[in-house]
Amino acid sequence: MSPSDVPINWKRNLTVAWLGCFLTGAAFSLVMPFLPLYVEQLGVTGHSALNMWSGLVFSITFLFSAIASPFWGGLADRKGRKIMLLRSALGMAIVMLLMGLAQNIWQFLLLRALLGLLGGFVPNANALIATQVPRNKSGWALGTLSTGGVSGALLGPLAGGLLADQYGLRPVFFITASVLLVCFLLTLFFTRERFQPVSKKEMLHVREVVGSLKNPKLVLSLFVTTLIIQVATGSIAPILTLYVRELAGNVSNIAFISGMIASVPGVAALLSAPRLGKLGDRIGPEKILITALIISVLLLIPMSFVQTPWQLGVLRFLLGAADGALLPAVQTLLVYNASNQIAGRIFSYNQSFRDIGNVTGPLMGAAISASYGFRAVFCVTAGVVLFNAIYSWNSLRRRRETLAAK
């Protein structure tokens, strides 16, 4: 039997992709705890200037990722997903190394933008697994894969803070580059893909991509859902520590309590995502998506009325369990509605919407809290998610009616 006849071991690829998403998630979040401190070390002084530059270096990565994702997705559909994973991991490793050598804030800002341009490991990992896994296991596989990035993002800040305290700020960037290099090597030696390159002339143009979708309006609604999920998550991030301090009063361990409450949704998502993904394979990802959105609304509203940090922590844990089902359900529905030929671009478009949400959410949360107080953020966010639940339900209902008419 020739190598081309040997079946792809998608379970091994899933394991390697999970490790890759874990390492990239950890690498991205390793530097987050001390980002403002590094900005200050690069010569930025004054409260206002420090806030402005910290916000810029944080958000510029997502902005440039949103711009670049469709290009990399198209290239993945032409050249293959594995090569895009390798490009992303190696490119980010080099940029992280250079960040540790930055001498001024402008160099650092440019490198943060370059990090966004060269990213894309997670959407390409999703596209690779989505095109290899059996359709009846898509929900479980994509749910499991999502826990890789979540796990890395949970452990990254803790490890980054400890490493920065032990070795200083710059060495953490070098350690992060090493982590990404390990990700590159794992992908290079253990990921298998059988891909027939497509010439540029044979590639579908954007209109043809839209025309090839089984339900373009539904796919657009899924992109919007991804954006709103990130807006809802990000809107709470800027005010969480301050809200916890307001609830807790004068306590000595406010940082620890805030850290715990910030991390519990991720822990809950780790536990729920594979299980709810598997349930979605049985009963349909549509039901999982709508149910999780409605539960999210019902949990966000009481968050504005809690009286203690622990009440907030319990509600955020339950919210994390519901949120763990959302992105895998969206990705599974994207798999159902797009062919393998355009999977790279569809997942990259979805990533662009996710990045826009990552930028928009914190801005929305900060603006609402400045005008109306912390508690209003939860009510407005609940309203946004409720709108999305109704919009998604309507899009899915129309899809069912279209299928019934056929």
UniProtKB/Swiss-Prot annotation:
Molecular function (Gene Ontology), one example: transmembrane transporter activity
Entry's localization field: Cell inner membrane
Transmembrane segments: 16-36, 56-76, 90-110, 113-133, 144-164, 171-191, 222-242, 254-274, 288-308, 317-337, 376-396
Record's bilayer topology term: Multi-pass membrane protein
GO annotation, cellular component aspect: plasma membrane
Highest taxon in the source lineage: Bacteria
Chief subcellular location: membrane
Protein keywords: Cell inner membrane, Cell membrane, Membrane, Transmembrane, Transmembrane helix, Transport
Keyword Metal-binding belongs to the record: no
Short name of any one Pfam family annotated for the protein: MFS_1
NCBIfam families, A to Z: PRK09874.1 (NF007372)
Family: Belongs to the major facilitator superfamily. DHA1 family. MdtG (TC 2.A.1.2.20) subfamily.
Identification of the protein by name: Multidrug resistance protein MdtG
Protein source organism: Citrobacter koseri (strain ATCC BAA-895 / CDC 4225-83 / SGSC4696)
